[in-house]
Amino acid sequence: MDRTVWDSTRRVEQVSTRRSVVSRALVGMTLVAVAGGAAADGPGRGSTATFERNYLVFIIDHHYSALRMSELAAGTDTQRDAAVSNPTEGTAPTPGFAATVAKASDDQIRSMARQANRTQREEIMKAQRFLRDWYGVQHEPQLSAEGRNMLTVLDSTPAGSQFNQTFLRMFSNHHLSALAPSVHCQVKSDIAHNGLLRYCENIVVTQKNGINDMREMLCKNYSDCGFVPATGDRRKDLFF
């Protein structure tokens, strides 16, 4: 074969080979992108789906009881004040519950309760959206047995200093009950559901910080510096 022809043929083969490699790479990238997109926009894969559904229902109901607990502390207010800073302002009332006068006498506790109420309303809506978009589930918040028991105690606790202390201890316990499931969420949810991962990470941080804020209040204001929150699971509470 003439050398010029041989060189030309070789170049054509090299170009063809490179195009084939690039084409296969692009196909592979497309398949990965499609697979990733399907997982990100759809239900969890394998066992992650069951975990995600159970977790999202749990956190919706958990936060729902927190709304009422925080209302008892801060009070409800159907006519919100336009002022940014108003220590007497209450929260928006939860459907199904009557308007409530604030039982906490400490401005710091009422402020914390208002903030928790607003944050957890948003987190309930986000969890409902995950359930609806990924699993076609419409879940309305419900009070768990644990939540009902806590509300019964807070309802019967006299307003003022006694309520302040009871609320701080009980709301700390309530926060703690969301920590372990949310830590599990970080390693059991579908790895393509980055939005849920960030959601669970944020709950871990905010609940943990909230617990320690309340422990500091108990220590500073009521000399209860040895308080340890509990989940109600005696085995875990005694050993961990």
Q: Where are the regions that the model predicts?
A:
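Sec/Tat signal peptide C-region and signal peptidase I cleavage site
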Residues: 36-39
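N-terminal secretory signal peptides
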Residues: 1-16, 25-33
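A short, ordered amphipathic alpha-helix with a cationic face
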Residues: 16-18, 171-172
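All-alpha RGS (Regulator of G-protein Signaling) helical domain and cognate RGS-like helical scaffolds
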Residues: 41-240
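A periodicity- and composition-biased signal for non-globular, repetitive helical segments
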Residues: 9, 24-25, 30, 69, ...
